Amino acid sequence: MKVAVLGAAGGIGQALALLLKTQLPSGSELSLYDIAPVTPGVAVDLSHIPTAVKIKGFSGEDATPALEGADVVLISAGVARKPGMDRSDLFNVNAGIVKNLVQQVAKTCPKACIGIITNPVNTTVAIAAEVLKKAGVYDKNKLFGVTTLDIIRSNTFVAELKGKQPGEVEVPVIGGHSGVTILPLLSQVPGVSFTEQEVADLTKRIQNAGTEVVEAKAGGGSATLSMGQAAARFGLSLVRALQGEQGVVECAYVEGDGQYARFFSQPLLLGKNGVEERKSIGTLSAFEQSALEGMLDTLKKDIALGEEFVNK
């Protein structure tokens, strides 16, 4: 199983590469690519960690050597948020980066599963889909927007509030991956109940958690380490499913049946072909139903922005 990380010299990319080097199954290959000249050195640094994962680093304009034979491609390349910016401010720079890298994936490893981490995910996934479609290689079961950070944050905040072990809480999060489009389904967490105020406060905290980190880092970056952990969790789940493990479920932002929007984050059963089944979002509380209806315009606009970027 070969995993490629594009944007591997960045804050998320390095954290992700470290976690994959230590946690990928024995015999896996890990390929690191970034435009930054330091990237082969990051691979040498990680190669000294004693795990049976082969690692190589590539830099420069051409990602092809890193992508050859990849089964999973995780894309974290792009600029990070600074205080006062929201994820959509990143669009102008990151849209072009994602378009370019996905064009290279389409040429070199068109059958790979692709996880998009680069923000704004609501839009960059639509860009990736349109690029793959133009190249004639789009498979909607193999393109994912990685929203796992919203899930791990939800798990952490709920566990803190309710005095639970973080490992025993799993909150499904649906919708998109920014602001009001992030909708944690707190009504579906087994064995935990919340007051209306707690639901409102937690939902808001989960939606704004990225900004909390950006502000706390005071201009020094955005959420890189927790995002690295979230991306590793998703990537490792995908690898296990591709290798035939049954019953692997993760939430991610994918093209579905269009019931809510063309792309929508929901629980997915993963398997040898990527998405095996898009699971139902289940029964929502009145609060969740209203939040879902209220976000769809924003989500659809985000998606249209990405489609237009490729097709203009």
From Swiss-Prot:
The keyword NAD applies. One of its GO terms (biological process) is tricarboxylic acid cycle. It catalyses: (S)-malate + NAD(+) = oxaloacetate + NADH + H(+). It comes from the Bacteria. GO terms for molecular function: L-malate dehydrogenase (NAD+) activity. Its EC number is 1.1.1.37. NAD(+) binds at residues 7-13, 34, 94, 117-119, 227. Homodimer. Belongs to the LDH/MDH superfamily. MDH type 1 family. This is Malate dehydrogenase.
